[in-house]
Structure formats: structure tokens, C-alpha cells
């Protein structure tokens, strides 16, 4: 989700794109529009209170936020300064034609509470002291609208928890172990298989081209990741090269890829999702409504959706990326630390001017 990180140096990565000159003045100044307060309810159960401090009503996007009912990452969990492994799902959402059900309306001054259990998506059975925090950017539409127009940057309070490991072990896990005997990467629908194979080939070409371009175009690295530090550029290129390799490894790669959702985690507005703990990527029905490659600057397509999802897979490159923000406006508001660990920063960086020289692979 738009989330958390407390670790000062999340060293890695990123995404390729070399143009789409949208004016920086296009970004609303919404640094203090949301107040997020975390409270402990009982052992591993947490309450988030979201307050609209803006001077107008908003429609907040629910996906990958506190409003998401799915097993998405709502807070970062740390023990002794080290992040705890997340065992839920990472989703890529549409940034266009979203249904009204994808939003939560909030009036000026209104507070909305949401409760969740952090033990449902992380193993906390060791017990003891933990710290949790959430930060990122929540996309929004204006009141009664569904067109994303900006993003509210937020950072919650840091909350310390004393967790009983035995009690944490009794919490039902949101994602059950997968049957390793099931060949989930077999796609029996020929049309979907053809689309997926094309997307993988296009992703391989696109990510490889973008990795090379990262070295040649520090101005664009600055635009998407807010740094031209050589170490960061190398990290960006390394992740993209890894994604290119994985996209081209249809038989012996580190991930499994399902062309249909057998786990009922798709819903309107979701393009695909990844289970990082299983290195499994799953396409949703709306994935197949996307073009193979878009000519629209910062648009979405099948190739960059594959690229986005592989950024979530630890088997491709570690540390795997989170979903701190979605869309160009949102990712432009992230700090360098969060941008380098944000999957959509990768897919947007990949969707740039150099695409004009990229031929769609059609066979």
C-alpha cells in the first residue's frame, strides 16, 4: 500500500522512463491534507483514524490504503529496526475509468476509523517489542468524481507495540499456503496466454532499454526518483535488468505467473496482483482490456503492468518494492527513499519518450 518504511536506507531501485514532460506545477500542494493516527486496540489489532484537514470534501482511493478490505500492507512493521516480512498481496490498480466503489468520500474535518490485524499478513509469533508506521501518498478525486486529480501525502505517528507471540499465532492468516503441486502458471485460455506472452516479451525489451537509459539520462532519474546519486542510478538499472531477465524467462524464472485469478483477489479497478511471499503474479480480467503498449504519456498497458508486478517479487530483485504511491502526481511527491522502493515509480519511469522508438512485439 502507500506505506511505510522506517528503515533509513532502503537501497534499491526503480523504473524507467524518459520523457513525458508534464509541468511540475501540475502537482497540487497537498502535504497536510490528511492526518493519520494509529492506536493499539489489543495485541496485534490496530486502529487507524483518517482525518480530512483539507478545506473541501474528497474522494479518497481505497486500494492499497487503510480503506482496502483486502490483505494489503497498511503499515510497516519493524523489530529492532529491521522490517518484518509482509505476507499479503500487492496490487496494481487502474488510474482511469475507476468505479465509484473504488473511493471513500470524506468531508472537511471528518474522521474515519478503520481497524485491522497486523498478524493476518505478517508472522509476529516471536513476540516482544515492535514498531509500526505508515507513510506515502493517497490518490484522490474531487467530491462525487472518479477522475484522479491529486494525492494527499501523509505520515502517521510511530506506534510501539508489545506483542504476545502466542496470541499472535492464533490470528488467521489472510493468505494460506499455496499447493505447490498446482501448476498455476499454465494458462489454458489461448487468447489470454497469447496476450500474457506478448506482455512478457514487451516487458523484457522495455525494462532492458530503460535500464540502459537510466545511465544516459540522469535528468529523468531525478524526475522520478529525486536523485542522481550514482549508487541509486546503479540500483535503478540493476532492478530493471533483473525484471528484464525475469520477463524473458518463461520456463525457468523465479516467479510463477497466473493468467487468471483463482484466489478471488481481483475486483473492479485492479489490473493484477502479486503475492511476494510466494513469488506469484496474477492477472485480473481488466488486465486484458489494456493495450499491449500505450502511446499515452504515463498511461497504463500490459507490458508496464508486468513490469510493475515483477518489481513486487523478491525472487526477481531484493528488497522487493512496495506500493507507496500510484500515478505520476503521487510518485512525484515521494521522498527519494520511498521512490526508490515504489513499484509504480518503476512502471512510470519505463513509460517515457524512448518508447516512441520501441516497436510493439506482436508475435
From Swiss-Prot:
GO terms for molecular function: metal ion binding; metalloendopeptidase activity. Its cofactor is Zn(2+). Keywords: Cleavage on pair of basic residues, Disulfide bond, Hydrolase, Metal-binding, Metalloprotease, Protease, Secreted, Signal, Virulence, Zinc, Zymogen. Binds 1 zinc ion per subunit. It catalyses: Preferential cleavage of bonds with hydrophobic residues in P1'. Also 3-Asn-|-Gln-4 and 8-Gly-|-Ser-9 bonds in insulin B chain. It is an enzyme of class 3 (hydrolase). Residues 1-19 form the signal peptide. Gene3D superfamilies: 2.60.40.2970, Collagenase (Catalytic Domain). It is found in: Secreted. GO terms for biological process: proteolysis. InterPro entries: Fungal_M35_metalloproteases (IPR050414), MetalloPept_cat_dom_sf (IPR024079), Peptidase_M35 (IPR001384). It comes from the Eukaryota. GO terms for cellular component: extracellular region. Its EC number is 3.4.24.39. PROSITE patterns: ZINC_PROTEASE. The active site is at residue 309. PANTHER family: NEUTRAL PROTEASE 2-RELATED, PTHR37016. Secreted metalloproteinase that allows assimilation of proteinaceous substrates. Shows high activities on basic nuclear substrates such as histone and protamine. May be involved in virulence. Belongs to the peptidase M35 family. This is Neutral protease 2 homolog MEP7. It comes from Coccidioides posadasii (strain C735) (Valley fever fungus).
Amino acid at each position: 500500500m502507500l506505506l511505510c518504511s522506517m528503515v533509513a536506507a532502503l537501497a534499491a531501485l526503480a523504473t524507467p522512463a524518459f520523457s513525458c514532460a508534464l509541468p511540475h506545477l501540475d502537482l497540487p500542494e497537498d502535504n497536510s491534507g490528511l492526518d493519520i493516527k494509529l492506536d493499539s486496540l489489543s495485541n496485534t489489532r490496530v486502529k487507524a483514524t483518517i482525518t480530512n484537514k483539507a478545506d473541501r470534501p474528497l474522494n479518497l482511493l481505497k486500494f492499497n490504503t487503510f480503506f482496502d478490505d483486502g490483505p494489503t500492507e497498511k503499515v510497516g512493521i519493524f523489530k529492532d529496526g529491521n522490517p518484518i516480512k509482509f505476507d499479503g498481496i500487492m496490487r496494481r490498480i487502474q488510474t482511469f475509468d475507476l468505479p465509484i466503489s473504488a473511493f471513500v468520500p470524506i468531508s472537511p474535518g471528518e474522521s474515519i476509523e478503520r481497524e485491522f490485524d497486523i498478524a493476518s499478513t505478517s508472522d509476529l509469533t516471536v513476540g516482544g517489542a515492535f514498531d509500526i508506521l505508515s507513510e506515502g501518498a493517497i490518490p484522490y478525486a474531487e467530491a462525487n468524481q472518479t477522475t484522479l486529480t491529486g494525492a494527499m501525502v501523509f505520515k502517521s505517528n510511530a506506534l510501539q507495540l508489545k506483542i504476545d507471540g502466542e496470541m499472535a499465532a492464533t490470528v488467521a492468516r489472510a493468505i494460506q499456503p499455496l499447493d505447490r503441486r498446482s501448476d498455476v502458471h499454465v494458462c489454458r485460455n489461448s487468447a489470454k496466454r497469447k496476450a500474457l506472452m506478448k506482455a512478457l516479451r514487451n516487458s523484457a525489451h522495455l525494462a532492458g532499454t530503460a535500464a540502459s537509459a537510466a545511465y544516459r539520462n540522469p535528468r529523468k532519474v531525478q524526475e522520478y526518483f529525486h536523485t542522481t546519486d550514482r549508487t541509486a542510478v546503479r540500483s535503478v538499472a540493476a532492478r530493471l535488468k533483473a525484471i528484464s531477465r525475469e520477463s524473458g524467462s518463461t520456463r525457468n524464472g523465479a516467479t510463477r505467473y497466473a493468467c487468471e485469478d483463482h484466489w478471488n483477489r481481483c475486483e473492479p479497478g485492479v489490473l493484477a496482483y502479486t503475492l511476494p511471499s510466494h513469488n506469484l503474479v496474477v492477472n485480473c480480467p481488466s488486465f486484458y482490456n489494456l493495450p499491449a503498449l500505450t502511446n499515452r504519456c504515463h498511461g497504463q498497458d500490459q507490458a508496464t503492468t508486468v513490469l510493475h508486478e515483477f518489481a513486487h517479487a523478491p525472487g526477481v530483485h531484493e528488497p522487493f518494492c512496495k506500493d507507496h504511491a500510484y500515478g505520476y502526481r503521487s510518485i512525484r511527491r515521494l521522498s527519494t527513499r520511498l521512490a526508490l522502493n515504489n513499484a509504480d515509480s518503476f512502471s512510470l519511469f519505463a513509460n517515457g519518450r524512448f518508447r516512441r522508438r520501441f516497436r510493439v512485439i506482436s508475435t
